[in-house]
Amino acid sequence: MSVRTVAIAAGGTGGHVYPGLAVADALRERGHRVVWLGTRAGLEGRVVPAAGLDAEWLEIGGMRGKGLATIAALPWRLGRAVAVAGAALRRQRPDVVLGMGGYVAGPVGLAARLAGRPLIIHEQNARAGMTNRFLARLGHRVLTGFPDALGARSEWVGNPIRTRIHRLESPQERYARREGAPRVLVLGGSQGARALNRYVPQALSAIGGGQPQVLHQAGELTLEEARTEYGRAGLDGAEVVPFIEDMAGAYAWADLVVARSGALTVAELAAAGVPAVLVPLPWAVDDHQTANAEWLCAAGAARRLLQPDLEQGALGPVLAELLGDRRRLAEMGEAARGVARPDATDRVATICEEVAHG
């Protein structure tokens, strides 16, 4: 198969950027050239150069906002963003454009269609955002991380994630060897989650039966805040870190995860086969995190608590119930793995090749 150039448009948060990087790695392993279209201000401005990818940095701002001035300026801002994206596509001449989300993907998708470049859309969340609902009408192929997120034309391929997570032992094998205190992995994301910092230590300290082992990823911004909360709760043995480099190892270690329900987190939980208590971000756009969590709960792999539930003390009883029964946790882990899409990265890469070759 001849070498093709694939442009990946994604930016802003890890939920868009890291799946894009997974696909980029797969395409490069197959000998193709990949160029990234994003903004320097987003997460991609740091991690894309570190991955050794060529990039076009676009001066594009978000399109959502409130107020008459913002609404009145929208046509001009969108037109300028599409023009900037179009210039980048003329320079790079990609054979196919893959939109992976974030506000950069909208203008790039429009520019791709105006330039006659084949367009593939990938929607990571169970509830599609406004941009992808529009771009789905223009895409040559429409891919989703969850079933039925973009209607009848869409193909459920799953969310591309880090390969090592798929290679973990089965939940039954992992839990069969477990002894001692339960192990809780708390994921607050790169920005931290203040609600988890506050309420998880309180809940763990109240369940009794000895202290659990805790690994809490709190992000740089709320690191000291989280450490303080564990100290107040008397859980001095909790390990609170800004970032976890080896996520596969962390999932393999954990009995239970407490986390927000971003698309990437939910996909990794399914692939790893780890049960979870999910607390959707209350102000997530289109409330997509609630939809993500409900999908994993429907499979019997997770429990969902809303943030007000944490404030009312509901987390402690749920943790006590789950952490006291490793057999049940193993069953939930198997249920999680049962809905995983382990071939998502390769499938998206293959679809890029199919579209690029016409």
UniProtKB/Swiss-Prot annotation:
GO biological process entries: carbohydrate metabolic process; cell division; cell wall organization; lipid glycosylation; peptidoglycan biosynthetic process; regulation of cell shape
Enzyme Commission number(s) of this protein: 2.4.1.227
UniProt-recorded Gene Ontology molecular function terms: UDP-N-acetyl-D-glucosamine:N-acetylmuramoyl-L-alanyl-D-glutamyl-meso-2,6-diaminopimelyl-D-alanyl-D-alanine-diphosphoundecaprenol 4-beta-N-acetylglucosaminlytransferase activity; undecaprenyldiphospho-muramoylpentapeptide beta-N-acetylglucosaminyltransferase activity
Keywords, ordered alphabetically: Cell cycle, Cell division, Cell inner membrane, Cell membrane, Cell shape, Cell wall biogenesis/degradation, Glycosyltransferase, Membrane, Peptidoglycan synthesis, Transferase
Gene3D superfamilies per record: Glycogen Phosphorylase B (3.40.50.2000)
Transmembrane parts of this sequence: none
Pathway in which the depicted protein is active: Cell wall biogenesis; peptidoglycan biosynthesis
Entry's localization field: Cell inner membrane
Residues binding UDP-N-acetyl-alpha-D-glucosamine, per UniProt: T13, G14, G15, N125, R162, S190, I244, A263, L264, T265, V266, A267, E268, Q289
Any one of the GO CC terms: plasma membrane
Mode of membrane association: Peripheral membrane protein
Keyword Glycosyltransferase: yes
Main location: membrane
CDD domains assigned to the protein according to its UniProt record, in alphabetical order: GT28_MurG
Reaction(s) catalysed by this chain's protein: di-trans,octa-cis-undecaprenyl diphospho-N-acetyl-alpha-D-muramoyl-L-alanyl-D-glutamyl-meso-2,6-diaminopimeloyl-D-alanyl-D-alanine + UDP-N-acetyl-alpha-D-glucosamine = di-trans,octa-cis-undecaprenyl diphospho-[N-acetyl-alpha-D-glucosaminyl-(1->4)]-N-acetyl-alpha-D-muramoyl-L-alanyl-D-glutamyl-meso-2,6-diaminopimeloyl-D-alanyl-D-alanine + UDP + H(+)
SUPFAM superfamilies assigned: UDP-Glycosyltransferase/glycogen phosphorylase (SSF53756)
Function: Cell wall formation. Catalyzes the transfer of a GlcNAc subunit on undecaprenyl-pyrophosphoryl-MurNAc-pentapeptide (lipid intermediate I) to form undecaprenyl-pyrophosphoryl-MurNAc-(pentapeptide)GlcNAc (lipid intermediate II).
HAMAP family, per the entry: MurG
Protein family according to the UniProt entry: Belongs to the glycosyltransferase 28 family. MurG subfamily.
Name of protein: UDP-N-acetylglucosamine--N-acetylmuramyl-(pentapeptide) pyrophosphoryl-undecaprenol N-acetylglucosamine transferase
Gene that this sequence comes from: murG
